[in-house]
Regions:
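Family-specific signature for flavin-dependent thymidylate synthase
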Residues: 1-184
Length: 184
């Protein structure tokens, strides 16, 4: 199994939204800059200095539950995963805060050029252990639910996935808060 973080976004937006329910301004400092120098080149730059007060509020809301921690739905990670079909079948359990952008196609790979019954036969006989590569995105809120529900799973792929989650920025503070024993 291979897991590669492609992009992380939404931290600034989450900070901007954090105190809206309280009719207050964020206490953190954040910047976003996007430049397009020509038709094929884009540079984006994002930075955030999360204030202690905002971090305390984030942790408090996350510990209170998903309905209070809405802003962490906006922090999104795009990831490239190469794993067996059986892992992706289980991963589909997580629909809220998880989407598939694209995946390797068995139609254009092992079943290329086939059609009709021949195609159906080859696809129906694919072993569950065949590895495919997919690009998905997950919200931090979804990743927190995965940690809670899969940290002790029998499949080793889930342990690798949880270990990858630990590598994300602010994972300890925004995903594992209240679950610190699972972070070690």
């Amino acid at each position: 199994m291979k897991i590669e973080t492609l992009e992380i976004a939404g931290i600034n937006s989450a900070l901007a939204a954090l105190r809206l329910p309280f009719n207050k301004e964020p206490r953190s400092i954040f910047n976003f800059n996007l430049e397009s120098n020509d038709k094929n080149y884009i540079t984006s730059y994002s930075s955030a200095t999360i204030s202690d007060d905002d971090l305390i509020l984030l942790k408090t809301l996350i510990k209170r539950g998903d309905e209070h921690a809405k802003v962490v739905r906006g922090i999104v990670v795009w990831v490239k995963i190469t794993a067996p079909i059986y892992f992706f079948t289980e991963e589909e359990t997580y629909r809220a805060g998880h989407e598939r952008l694209s995946s390797q196609s068995t139609m254009h790979g092992v079943a290329k050029g086939l059609s009709g019954e021949e195609l159906v036969k080859v696809k129906s006989e694919l072993p569950m252990g065949v590895e495919l590569t997919k690009v998905d995105f997950f919200s931090y809120q979804c990743l927190r639910n995965i940690v809670k529900q899969r940290h002790n799973h029998r499949l080793p792929e889930w342990h690798k996935f949880v270990d990858w989650i630990k590598t994300l920025p602010f994972a300890k503070e925004l995903i594992f808060v209240g679950l610190e024993e699972l972070y070690e």
